[in-house]
């Protein structure tokens, strides 16, 4: 599979860490590490913004999606507050990961911990076309559990 080349700036507090990387041959997301100076403890029900120590320059027409790691959610109840988070092509600041602890125990984020995944995806920009009505479908306006069995 062909890829795109993306410029990445490592910030001073990134030193000694790994760039985001794919952890298996066909992984869609690259794991992102925490660039914390000291351990960060996230108590149950609390949130923390975790620095990554990197900034990226995405090409026009692409976004980076910051997604939870399933293992953190399953084992610790830790996920992202805004999942997925979107990094726009014109953003040049440090990428931060906003974690929340839904678990019962404090969660410790150590330097170099893999805290999220980054997926690079194409973006489709739309032009709206207002209409007084929409084409009818079998589903219609059924949503929020409309396919649940009674």
Curated annotation (Swiss-Prot):
One of its GO terms (molecular function) is dUTP diphosphatase activity. It catalyses: dUTP + H2O = dUMP + diphosphate + H(+). Pathway: Pyrimidine metabolism; dUMP biosynthesis; dUMP from dCTP (dUTP route): step 2/2. Belongs to the dUTPase family. GO terms for biological process: dUMP biosynthetic process; dUTP catabolic process. Coiled coil: none annotated. Keywords: Hydrolase, Magnesium, Metal-binding, Nucleotide metabolism. Substrate binds at residues 69-71, 82, 86-88. Its cofactor is Mg(2+). It comes from Syntrophus aciditrophicus (strain SB). InterPro entries: dUTPase, dUTPase-like, dUTPase-like_sf, dUTPase_trimeric. This enzyme is involved in nucleotide metabolism: it produces dUMP, the immediate precursor of thymidine nucleotides and it decreases the intracellular concentration of dUTP so that uracil cannot be incorporated into DNA. Gene3D superfamilies: 2.70.40.10. The gene is dut. Pfam families: dUTPase. HAMAP family: dUTPase_bact (MF_00116). This is Deoxyuridine 5'-triphosphate nucleotidohydrolase.
């Amino acid at each position: 599979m062909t890829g795109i080349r993306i410029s990445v700036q490592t910030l001073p507090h990134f030193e000694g860490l790994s760039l985001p990387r794919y952890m298996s041959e066909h992984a869609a997301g690259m794991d992102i590490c925490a660039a914390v100076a000291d351990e960060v403890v996230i108590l149950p029900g609390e949130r923390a913004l975790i620095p990554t120590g990197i900034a990226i320059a995405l090409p026009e027409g692409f976004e980076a999606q910051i997604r939870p790691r399933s293992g953190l959610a399953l084992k610790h109840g830790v996920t992202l507050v805004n999942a997925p988070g979107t990094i726009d092509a014109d953003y040049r600041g440090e990428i931060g990961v906003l974690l929340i602890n839904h678990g019962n125990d404090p969660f410790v984020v150590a330097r170099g911990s893999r805290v999220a995944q980054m997926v690079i995806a194409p973006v489709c920009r739309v032009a709206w076309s207002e209409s007084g009505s929409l084409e009818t479908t079998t589903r219609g306006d059924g949503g929020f559990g409309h396919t649940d069995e009674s």
